[in-house]
Amino acid sequence: MPTYNERENLPVAVERLTALPVADLHVLVVDDNSPDGTGEVADKLAADLPNVVSVLHRTEKDGLGRAYIAGITKALDEGADVVIQMDADLSHPAEVIPAMLEKLETSGAGVVLGSRYVPGGSTADEWKWHRKALSAWANFYVNLILRLGVKDATAGFKAWEADTLRAIDVASIKSNGYSFQVEMNYRTVKKGIAIAEVPIRFEERTKGASKMTLKVQLESAAMPWKLLFGRAV
């Protein structure tokens, strides 16, 4: 779970995760030296729940992709069988994780996406029409170019088999920001590994600020073409 300025949301996210009926669940917080003190909040949570929560402190904020690579690498090194990616801003519903794990076990897929766009999935009522249109267009755009065959190509809520993460060589991924999610999916499809989806309701954050900058949007627009022509893999 990568964090940057999420001191208000992180304790709630951890509380929801630790309440799940999931055996051997471990929460790894990857904090990018948040100036609002998120790292200190994470350390307090780890001290209170030493067998459940741990913290990886990074010295600088250099992108969502780099934070995920650091966290996934640490999780694999520590012997995780399944790695779950999720945001700390409470937009991803933790209560769906058991269903994602069941789907991962029964479907034969190497990764399960928490999907806004399969039947039963939805986005927050607070989303304005233009944001919904942009999200729908982004998914259409990515699938048109890369033929991923999934409904939510830009999803950031995922449950991965450890072997799948090793197969796609996460550490070598070059993209950053939200395009990191697309590149992970693309590498999975190129390896012939199945992707499954379960419906979620994506909620709007109520605390803190979005990290979706113009730079991130431009990178996300260019990345599918780079992947298609082999310049990013």
Give the predicted meaning of each segment.
Residues 31-40, 90:
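A conserved acidic beta->alpha catalytic loop
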Residues 58-77, 94-178, 205-219:
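Acceptor/aglycone-binding surface of glycosyltransferases and processive sugar-polymer synthases
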Residues 8-12, 36-45:
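Acidic helix N-cap motif at the loop->helix transition within catalytic regions
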Residues 80-91:
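Short beta-strand-to-loop acidic/aromatic patch adjacent to the donor-nucleotide binding site
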Residues 149, 172-176, 185-201:
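Catalytic donor-sugar/metal-binding loop of nucleotide-sugar-dependent glycosyltransferases
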Residues 15-24:
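Short, acidic, metal-binding catalytic loop of nucleotide-sugar glycosyltransferases
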Residues 24-34, 56-57:
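Short beta-strand/loop segment that forms part of the nucleotide-sugar
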Residues 1-15, 33:
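Active-site beta-to-alpha loop of glycosyltransferases that engages the nucleotide-sugar donor
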